[in-house]
C-alpha cells in the first residue's frame, strides 16, 4: 500500500473552537472543525449532525477559535488536551518552568503533577442497585477553558506549530488582553522592532507576536451585533461602561474575587462576563481585525460577481460563506454599521470591520505573486514577469506531457533550475515542495489595527510586501532558522535539541524591512503554491493555450469568445420564445378542441330527429335479411349498424323516395 506521506497537504483551514451556552453561561464545550460557521449551526440545531452533548443547552455562542493546524490529527490532539486538561500529559509541571519573558523557576517538587487538576467528581448515584462509578471531571468553567488554552499555546509541541487565535466575543478578547497585561516582560504590540521574543514553558524562544490574534465581534456567522456599534444603553446592559470605573480599595484580609484555578499562575474574575472585568469603551478603542480578501487571480477558479449592497442592507449583519462548508454570502466582507449620531461618543463612529475568512486565499495570492517575481528574476531576467512566468509554465507543461509516455520521457526539455541562495546547489523549480521563497512575512496575512479615532487601518507591524528574490532548499532554510535560535542568549538545552525551528528571518534579506516569520507559515505558503501550480498545469494542458494567451487573449480569440457567448444567448432566447409559443399553441389547441367538441354535441342534439327517421327507414331491409330485433338492446345495435352502413353507401345506391 503506498504511503500517504507523499500526498500529504496542509488543509486551508482547520480550527478548535470554544462554545459557551447562552441559556446557562457556565456550560462550555470544546470541539474541532474545518468550518466553524456551519458547525455552530449544527450545534444550535439548524443543521443535522450536531453533537449530542450540545442538544440541551441551546443556543450556543462561539467565543474563540484556535486555527492554523497542519492536519486534522494535529487539531484532534489539541482538542483532546483542551477538553481534558486534567489528563493531558502536556499540562503537567516541568522540572523548571519558564515565564513568558524567559525567567526560570524551580518547580521540581511539583514535577509530574497536573496544572489543572479536577475539582469535582461525578455524582455517586445508584443505578439498578449498583453504585455509579465516580470519575474526575475536568474544570469546564469559561475561565478554566480560557486559561487552559493559554497554557497549551505555551506548551510543547503546540508552541512550535504557529497557531493563531480568533475572538468572536468582547469578553473572550478582553479577558485574554487582561491576562497578557498581567504577564511581566510583555511590551505593547505597536511596532515589531521593539518587541522581544516570548518563551515557552520549557524555555524555547518563540515569535514576538505569537500567537497572532484577530477579532471579529460580528460573530463566527456574522449574525452578532458588535458592542462598538450599539448605543450606550445597550452597552450598559451588557456591562460595558463609557469610562473606567474606580475600584474600591479592599482590605488585605479580604480575599480577591478571583477564581482559584489550579496551580496555574494566571487568574480571572469569578464572574465570567464584561461587568466582572470592569470593561469600558476605552478597552475597545483598538483591536486587531482580519485583512480584507485579496482579489482572486487563479485562472482555475471562477471568480464570483460582487454584489453591491444597498443602504438598507449595509447595516445588517453579513452572512459568511464557505464554499465547501455550506455557508452563504461570500460576496460581502466589510461590515459598516452606521451608529446613531445622538450618541455623542468618539467610539461610536462608523468603523469598518472586516469579516473573518476561513481559508488561505490571502497567503496563496501573496505567495504566488512572490513566486512570479522570483521566476522573472532568476529564470527570465530580460523579460517581463508575465512573459517569464508563461515560458516557465510552458516548459513545465511540455515536461509533464513528455513524462506520460516512456518513449518521450528521456527526450523531455530540461527542467528550469536556480541556485540555492545558501548552498549554491541547483534547485528544480518544477518540484514545488523542494524549495521555499523568501520567508519575509506576507503583509496581507498580518492583522489590521482597527481604531475608533482614525478611519484608516494600520497593520500590526509596518512590514510591507518587500520579499527578496532568493530561493532556498527547505532543509537549508531550516538550518539557518535553527542557528538563529541557538544564537539567542536565553536559549536553553531543550531548544538546542530542537529538530524544527519555530521562527526566523530571511538570511539573504537586506534592508529595514527584515522581519521574523513563523516556520509554520513558511511551510503553509509552500503547500499553497504547490497546489496552485498543479492546478494551473492541468488547466493549461486542457486548454492548449499558454498563460500569456489566457491573461492577454488576442483580439480574434476574444471576439470569437464574445461571439460564441452572444450566439448562446440568442439561441437560449429563441428557444425560450419557441417554448412559450408552443405552450400558447397547446393552450389554443386545448381551447379549440373543447369548443369543437361542444359544437359537435350541440349539432348532434339538433339533428337527432332526422337521424331517428333515417334509422327507421333503414330498419326494414335489415329485418328482411333475417336479423332478429329483440328489445331495446337489439334496437340500439341496429341503429349503430344502419348508421355506419348509411355512411358507407355511395350516392348511386341511395334510393330516391320522391
UniProtKB/Swiss-Prot annotation:
Residues 12-92 form the GIY-YIG domain. It is found in: Nucleus. Keywords: DNA damage, DNA recombination, DNA repair, Endonuclease, Hydrolase, Nuclease, Nucleus. One of its GO terms (cellular component) is Slx1-Slx4 complex. Its cofactor is a divalent metal cation. Its EC number is 3.1.-.-. The keyword Transmembrane does not apply. One of its GO terms (molecular function) is crossover junction DNA endonuclease activity. Residues 641-652 have a biased composition (Polar residues). Residues 29-52, 239-269, 288-328, 594-658 are annotated as: Disordered. Residues 308-324, 627-640 have a biased composition (Basic and acidic residues). One of its GO terms (biological process) is double-strand break repair via homologous recombination. The keyword DNA damage applies. It comes from the Eukaryota. It holds the Pfam family SLX1_C. Forms a heterodimer with SLX4. Catalytic subunit of the SLX1-SLX4 structure-specific endonuclease that resolves DNA secondary structures generated during DNA repair and recombination. Has endonuclease activity towards branched DNA substrates, introducing single-strand cuts in duplex DNA close to junctions with ss-DNA. Belongs to the SLX1 family. This is Structure-specific endonuclease subunit SLX1. It comes from Mycosarcoma maydis.
Amino acid at each position: 500500500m503506498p504511503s500517504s506521506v507523499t500526498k500529504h497537504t496542509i488543509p486551508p483551514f482547520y480550527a478548535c473552537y470554544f462554545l459557551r451556552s447562552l441559556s446557562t453561561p457556565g456550560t462550555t464545550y470544546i470541539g474541532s472543525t474545518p468550518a466553524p460557521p456551519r458547525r455552530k449551526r449544527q450545534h444550535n440545531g439548524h443543521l443535522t449532525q450536531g453533537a449530542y452533548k450540545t442538544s440541551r443547552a441551546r443556543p450556543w455562542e462561539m467565543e474563540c477559535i484556535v486555527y492554523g493546524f497542519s492536519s486534522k490529527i494535529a487539531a484532534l490532539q489539541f482538542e483532546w488536551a483542551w477538553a481534558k486538561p486534567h489528563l493531558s500529559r502536556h499540562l503537567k509541571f516541568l522540572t523548571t518552568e519558564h515565564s513568558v519573558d524567559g525567567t526560570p523557576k524551580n518547580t521540581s517538587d511539583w514535577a509530574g503533577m497536573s496544572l489543572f487538576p479536577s475539582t469535582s467528581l461525578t455524582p455517586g448515584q445508584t443505578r439498578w442497585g449498583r453504585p455509579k462509578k465516580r470519575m474526575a471531571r475536568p474544570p469546564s468553567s469559561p475561565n478554566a477553558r480560557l486559561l487552559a488554552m493559554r497554557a497549551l499555546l505555551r506548551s510543547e509541541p503546540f508552541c512550535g506549530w504557529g497557531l493563531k487565535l480568533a475572538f468572536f466575543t468582547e469578553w473572550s478578547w478582553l479577558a485574554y488582553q487582561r491576562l497578557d497585561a498581567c504577564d511581566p516582560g510583555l511590551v505593547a504590540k505597536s511596532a515589531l522592532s521593539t518587541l522581544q521574543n516570548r518563551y515557552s514553558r520549557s524555555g524555547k524562544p518563540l515569535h514576538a507576536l505569537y500567537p497572532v490574534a484577530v477579532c471579529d465581534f460580528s460573530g463566527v456567522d456574522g449574525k452578532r451585533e458588535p458592542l462598538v456599534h450599539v448605543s450606550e444603553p445597550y452597552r450598559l446592559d451588557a456591562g460595558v461602561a463609557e469610562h473606567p470605573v474606580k475600584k474600591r480599595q479592599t482590605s488585605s484580609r479580604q480575599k480577591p474575587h478571583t477564581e482559584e484555578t489550579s496551580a496555574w499562575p494566571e487568574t480571572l474574575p469569578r464572574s465570567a462576563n464584561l461587568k466582572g472585568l470592569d470593561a469600558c469603551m476605552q478597552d475597545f478603542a483598538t483591536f486587531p481585525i482580519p485583512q480584507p480578501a485579496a482579489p482572486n487571480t487563479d485562472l482555475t477558479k471562477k471568480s464570483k460577481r460582487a454584489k453591491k449592497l444597498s443602504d438598507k442592507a449595509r447595516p445588517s449583519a453579513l452572512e459568511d460563506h464557505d464554499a465547501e462548508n455550506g455557508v452563504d454570502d461570500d460576496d460581502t466582507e466589510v461590515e459598516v454599521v452606521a451608529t446613531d449620531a445622538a450618541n455623542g461618543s468618539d467610539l461610536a463612529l462608523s468603523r469598518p470591520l472586516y469579516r473573518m475568512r476561513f481559508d488561505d486565499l490571502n497567503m496563496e495570492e501573496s505567495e504566488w505573486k512572490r513566486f512570479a517575481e522570483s521566476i522573472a528574476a532568476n529564470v527570465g531576467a530580460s523579460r517581463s514577469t508575465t512573459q517569464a512566468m508563461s515560458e516557465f509554465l510552458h516548459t513545465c507543461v511540455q515536461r509533464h506531457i513528455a513524462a506520460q509516455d516512456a518513449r518521450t520521457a528521456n527526450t523531455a526539455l530540461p527542467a528550469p533550475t536556480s541556485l540555492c541562495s545558501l548552498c549554491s546547489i541547483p534547485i528544480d523549480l518544477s518540484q514545488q515542495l523542494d524549495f521555499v521563497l523568501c520567508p519575509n512575512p506576507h503583509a496581507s496575512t498580518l492583522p489590521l489595527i482597527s481604531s475608533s479615532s482614525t478611519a484608516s487601518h494600520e497593520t500590526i507591524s509596518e512590514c510591507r510586501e518587500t520579499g527578496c528574490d532568493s530561493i532556498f532548499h527547505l532543509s537549508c532554510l531550516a538550518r539557518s532558522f535553527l542557528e538563529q535560535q541557538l544564537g539567542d542568549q536565553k536559549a536553553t538545552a531543550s531548544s538546542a535539541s530542537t529538530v524544527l525551528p519555530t521562527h526566523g528571518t530571511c538570511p539573504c534579506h537586506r534592508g529595514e524591512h527584515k522581519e521574523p516569520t513563523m516556520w509554520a507559515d513558511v511551510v503553509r505558503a509552500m503547500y499553497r503554491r504547490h497546489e496552485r501550480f498543479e492546478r494551473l498545469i492541468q488547466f493549461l494542458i486542457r486548454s492548449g493555450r499558454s498563460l500569456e494567451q489566457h491573461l492577454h487573449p488576442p483580439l480574434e480569440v476574444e471576439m470569437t469568445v464574445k461571439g460564441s457567448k452572444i450566439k448562446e444567448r440568442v439561441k437560449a432566447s429563441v428557444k425560450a420564445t419557441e417554448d412559450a409559443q408552443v405552450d400558447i399553441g397547446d393552450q389554443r389547441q386545448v381551447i379549440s378542441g373543447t369548443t369543437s367538441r361542444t359544437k359537435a354535441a350541440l349539432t348532434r342534439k339538433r339533428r337527432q330527429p332526422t337521424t331517428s327517421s333515417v334509422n327507421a327507414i333503414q330498419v326494414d331491409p335489415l329485418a328482411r335479411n333475417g336479423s332478429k330485433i329483440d328489445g331495446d338492446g337489439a334496437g340500439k345495435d341496429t341503429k349503430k349498424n344502419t348508421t355506419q352502413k348509411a355512411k358507407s353507401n355511395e350516392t348511386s345506391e341511395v334510393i330516391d323516395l320522391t
